[in-house]
């Protein structure tokens, strides 16, 4: 992009911002993006009744590893939310319009920021957004999966922030969480996330925005995954596949597209390519576009999204942002623009679809059978994370952990140590067996605090020394206050009474509800081998402070 083009792009941004300031955040109409709804296995325009085909591109700016490392925690998020930055999105929208896209896939947004300007500007150009609910640091981990209060709160905050926009097409509850046969046990957690996100939308007076899943194209798992997410009582609303089988100048017959189309014929929910664009040949010719929107595939597939808009180290971009924050068009851009311009899928109206046949019944799909080493996703799902229950742990546990931040390796270290000393079954979640501990839905800090408190009680603690030497470990003075029979935490306390310590005379005091950090020695490797009493050291100042609290001086 030359200086003249950069100048005009800046003018467009300035004009749009002025219009927003003069007319308010609702100055742009959403008439060009009526809500898209699902009927059977198709997307339809809710006003015209015409079938909707996704013709889109992935749109997400990433921070480089070097940038994150040099920043030393200065950034609010590890990702860049372009939809919350009008300078970025308004710069890019003219180029997205040139591409001929009608949908963006965005992988992470900051729910604390306003997205009004960018979402309204996209709507003015007839563009929708498919949005992932997770973000890089808050998501379901395929190797150690959990569906807990922390992740659920993230999902709810995104839903609350974005559901008012009519051009919000749908949410992804996960992306490639199970990516091969070694981690199929992670899929029950994603399915639980779909269930709870849909339930939250339903009970929060939000528009009924669909929630789906984006998977990879692994040969060993793709059939079972496709069945798993539409079987049983909990089902995805749509299903995306990150598809990279077509490279260069492949064909419908040689690429694998023919086989995939046959496999998904009659699939009960909308299915589309949530990513496509193999880059083994550069510039990419994007010849797969003509096949995807052609007669052989458009009756099965609801379109797709090219990966991706921004050029990064992985070399999948169609534009490159230059040193002046301007946009330089790459050869891939011209090829994708040309292919999208030719794409003209022949759809069906909602009325024709309903008249031709009844929508496919999702209930008819049988869940895949468990096969060790092949498919190990149980039909039984984790329960909905219970925020109130988990918050009670913060009130009643004697020892408490606060987040370790950059020292995330401590979680694994401390869990390994504590679970060698106490029974951790109440925090374990097993997607293979369908067994989920009572507190497996709590945050990682709450789960670690529970196990630390067990060890504190196991060693017969009669003071306020928690058995880990770490600045993030606290003795919880709030736990010393006796619970009344009316307390909402009484049931939680009763459920762990047999594994936690009765603080005896401490309950007679009325300490402050603050938390007190203790300088307690972390057991050495030799001490960890002993199951008996562990010696702990504290500074004289801390001993004095504890004595003062016990005497009521700090009331």
UniProtKB/Swiss-Prot annotation:
Its EC number is 2.4.1.-. Changing residue 175 to A: Abolishes catalytic activity. (1,3-beta-D-glucosyl)n 2 binds at residues 176, 217, 222. This is 1,3-beta-glucanosyltransferase GAS2. It is found in: Cell membrane. It is a lipid-anchor; GPI-anchor. It comes from Saccharomyces cerevisiae (strain ATCC 204508 / S288c). GO terms for cellular component: cytoplasm; fungal-type cell wall; fungal-type vacuole; plasma membrane; side of membrane. Changing residue 244 to F/Q: Moderately reduces hydrolysis, and causes a 10-fold reduction in transglycosylation activity. Changing residue 275 to Q: Abolishes catalytic activity. The lineage of its organism: Eukaryota, Fungi, Dikarya, Ascomycota, Saccharomycotina.
